[in-house]
Amino acid sequence: MGHIETSGIFRPLPVNEITQEELERGFMGQEAERFIDMIVTRPPGKSAEIIEALMEQETAKGYQGRPLSRDQMNAKYGVGGWRPMPLFINEEEGGKQRLIANAKGGGHNKWTSEEETLFVMAIGFIAEAAYTLVEEYTKMYLPEGAKGWPTEELLSHLPEWLECGVGCDDMTDAFRQSPVAPAHQGTNVVAFYSTGKKAWRFVEVFGLVYGMRSSVLHFNRFPVLNTAVARRVGAAMTGSYVDDFNTADLTVANGSAQSFNGHVLSLNGGALGPDKHKPTRTQQVVLGVHVRLERLLDEGMVEFEPRAGTVHKIQDMASLMLERGTCTPAEAAKLRGTAAWAAGNTFGRAGRLGLKSLKDRQYQAQDETNEVTEDLRSGLQFLR
């Protein structure tokens, strides 16, 4: 909360710093009390029982404290010394229900200032890593000037053991692995309605929460540090995308770089999910993209293509809108997001050609029609 100091590793941002004095006056104290007054007078939402059940699971994992009453929280932090974020549920693809802290509604996001914005690896990192391995082999083992040979000739001199693959790992409950600073614990509190107690309860979360703006930047510092150590100490060609680690390596290395990256993470206090481990191989689904490296040595090619399931999803959504003749701004936003991600894996991002009309519909005025216009029809037909 308040001003987040820069780590010096991400892109700098111009910022109007929120001072501790401003935070105490405008967010904590009487303002916090007013906000809590508003929460405790709210009726329970339709998801109250589900939220309470999910909270019990989080408590059992040791990620948070036990539910406390308002009086108990006041006794611990003092009146006006804490401020909660109401919880709601976001249902993800596949039906998974995730607890989200409403840090926007709680005012937490507004009262946060940051000096930097994060960056993450692009999927093309894998091709760059494979090219680096080929380039280093060329420098070390082929005659001087071999880098200027025609591609076919250069490829004919590459050994089989230079075959490359990629392995993937994912952190377990990643945000919860990043502890909250003790000074900020009073604002890293979530609120939910207990159907058993028939009253609002408040819980201190010991790790980062989904929904708080600063959580994303704060969390990403850890995998970036881990990646830097794995690269410099173990020469592991790994890259992080939030809580995902993707490691390029020679297949004959039998996953040693991937294993070393996991070892570094463990030494730093992190944990990977064994059920999400994907061993190093020439074909891999990475960040939702099908990556193929088996043609690298024969044709000098690394392929990136959208998963078949993603393509079918885009086609089905576009077809449904065309058949109904309507498209809401929310539906346009969802289709645009999915199609834009897939388009990033096409040559020249050609798939983006049909997305302008979806963007126009996404941001249209509230009083405008949801009917499919001629421009939107053309865009949907392109995607279908």
Please provide the spans of the model-predicted regions.
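Nucleic-acid-interacting cores, centered on viral/eukaryotic replication and modification enzymes
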Residues: M1-R384
